[in-house]
Amino acid sequence: MVGRAIVDRHGLAPEVHPSDFGAVVAAACLAHDIGNPPFGHAGEDAMRAWFASHSAYLAGLDPDQRADLLNYEGNAQGFRILTHLQNPTNPGGLQLTCAVLATFAKYPRRSHLVEPLSGKSARKFGYFQAEAGLFAEVAETVGLIPRAAGAWFRHPLTFLVEAADDTCYLVVDIEDGVQQGCVSPEQAEELLLDLAGGIEAASRLKHLEDPKRRIEYLRARAIGRLVDEAARIFLENEAAILDGSFDHALFDVSPVGESLQKVRKVAEEQIYNARQVMEVMAAGYEVISGLLDGYVDGACGPQTARNRVWANLLPADFDQMAGESNYLRMLQVADMIAGMTDSYAVSAYRRLKGIELPG
């Protein structure tokens, strides 16, 4: 729908096919959380807190480098993974197109800004200083509109990636909340029915008795409606999106926005703050902090007997890739940890802290 409308509006055929736009958005969606460390946002918070409490390691770094670590961001880690870490010996990493990389970048700015910027796309940052040159090349290639030094307005298709993310995680989290006992089936039905469109969805629901099937049906209907609504809002606001004057989430200017806010409120109060979730987050802080304690000491600390042991646990090519820069060495440690799953990070922490021995 969106691809066809763009091709027709701008006379792009036959060089550009409508499905090309969908392919770019799909690739960016697939990659959008690739930079998240173990334990998700709790892992990001743990890494920020660790660097903030170890200021000695930040001495000698420039303001941009310090901001990268003090405000550690999974979105920037994702750009680094896609463009470098997936294939470190080959410039360009995963060899994605500039269109995909720009669409992936929800927050196309550096971490340290002289003057604060407003708008949804400036809430976080999207690349580390280590990749600043590459990000600028991507921005220039696709024609992102400069906004400030090291900052641009979003690629238009990024708004669709953001809408897809909001659609999936909010709707599916409610379904997960029912399975975990955090949300009652009746409450979930009420929330999802509102998103699904009310009367028509309710008429079909009368023929479904199994609670699980009822939730699954409403989830599918809600996602379908949100997809259609995202496409409609995008096309209605295309001109403002293209010139940079539109800088909100698509659903913020949609009739479904209020319903989504109700879902978000329930998710935050009953799911994200549930005891079992808090216990995982607490564990995440301890695990991430413990791994950083050892690995950063080994990479950047004084040559004590303990630190030499941790240094020997770093990858064989660590020195070659990071060199003498403490900034790059700490980014390299962050790369290692960000590449771990939750369970692997816990297992590594238990072994390396002596809670259990290998073998």
For every predicted segment, state its role.
Residues 173-186, 242-246, 301-307, 349-353:
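Composition- and surface-driven signal marking solvent-exposed, interaction-prone regions
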Residues 78, 288, 337:
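A residue-level signal for conserved active-site and pocket-lining positions in enzyme catalytic cores
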Residues 4, 83, 169-172, 176, ...:
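Charged/polar positions within long, soluble alpha-helices
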Residues 308-309, 332-359:
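C-terminal structured interaction module
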Residues 70, 280, 329-336:
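Conserved acidic
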Residues 197-328, 340, 358:
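C-terminal subdomains that position terminal phosphate/3'-OH groups for nucleotidyl transfer/ligation
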Residues 1-27, 34-218:
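Sequence-structural signature of the catalytic-core scaffold of metal-dependent phosphohydrolases
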Residues 5-13, 297-304, 355:
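Surface-exposed helix-capping loop/turn segments at secondary-structure junctions
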